[in-house]
Amino acid sequence: MLLTAPGGTVVQPDGLLVTPSRHVLLEAKGMGRSAFQSEQLSREFACVVRDAGNARPLLLLITPTAPPVPVKGHGRLPVGAAVRLFLVPVLARTSGLNTPLHDLIARIPDTVAWITWNEVQAAVADAHFDAAALPVSVAGTVQRLRDDLLKAIDWHRRS
């Protein structure tokens, strides 16, 4: 859970991956007809840029289909437009982010990326890993995680 400001709006991404060089906020949309909330991408963009520090920020969207993305009350929008849609009011309520609006808007293409569930599934299914180079227990865990992810994507697609 992230906050735009102390006592401010709660931002609840589906995942957060942090390394010394990357700060990745994950937002995964289900296979059904789910839409992003109207301010959601603006909030998540503001939080990932603010919280990245010296790391490179990335807002990674996992979606059922390629953009444009559905935004509640606004139809389907290109990703950049969906981020910009409520960026001004979100920034007014976001503490600790003092970057000028035009600089933030310029950063959207390098900060926001998307991949579809089909592409995730294909990448995982096609990925090769050298099980012989890993301890047996680690190789087994990696294989189980891979298989479980593929099964979960299939299950959600059918649901």
State where each predicted segment sits:
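Charged, terminal alpha-helix-loop-beta segments
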Residues: 1-159
